[in-house]
Amino acid sequence: NPTKKKRFNADTIEELKRKESGSSEDIIEMHIKNSKDSMLTVAELAKITALSLDEVKQDVDALEEKGIIKVFHMKKDSYTWHRDNGKMLQEEMIKTLQIYHEKHLYRYGMQKAEIHMTFMRKVKPNVFDLYMESLVGEGVMKRRNEFLSLPQHEIVKDRIYQQVESKLLTTFEKAGLDFPKVSEIDFGTVPFEVVEDILLLLMEEKKIIKLGEELYTLTSYIEKSRDYLFYVKRKRFDYHGGNSRCFGNKQEER
């Protein structure tokens, strides 16, 4: 059944005017534009407008070709998004990311899931991913793993960064296999949140490895330990294997 419309509703009046003009394409565009926090599917548009799926698909294709909307194709349906809504959303995301980058100097960006829940929670995650990929392709966003940032954002390894990095690497190097807790290391006036951010970056760069809750060490130590264990295991294998061959030879001689 068609959605019940309130009298004098602005969107309803606009729809009636467009219906009078006889342009189904205009009506489709209007509904897509009015859906500012979600993406209407072709099936939903057909239900709203009482048009056939084929008619809606034709209008959607025409709107996409004109650059008025974006269409994200999934297996079961196609999702539509108006360029005007996209511009407004991009402006909001850019402002949010600018503030975020200023506050968190040592992070690659906001987590993709956080941006999804903040701006487009009504959009399915896989459709949201397609939209973010399109923004990355257009140079609006930059992505690194599960982090999204502004294209120009780069982590500056300034004095504070170098101070924390040096403290962490030196402490873990001296500790060997004692695995000191990061929370027990003295970083002076540097906030612990900043220390955690730099620690995550060092893990990303494979300089430090996490072993457990608050347990970290140098990646080089783990690699050396792994090489040593492999060496010992190989020596034991060669020793026992050699003895077996010797015993086998003696038995053969008998």
Predicted regions and their residues:
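C-terminal effector modules of nucleic-acid-centric enzymes and ribosome-associated factors
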Residues: N1-K210, L218-R254
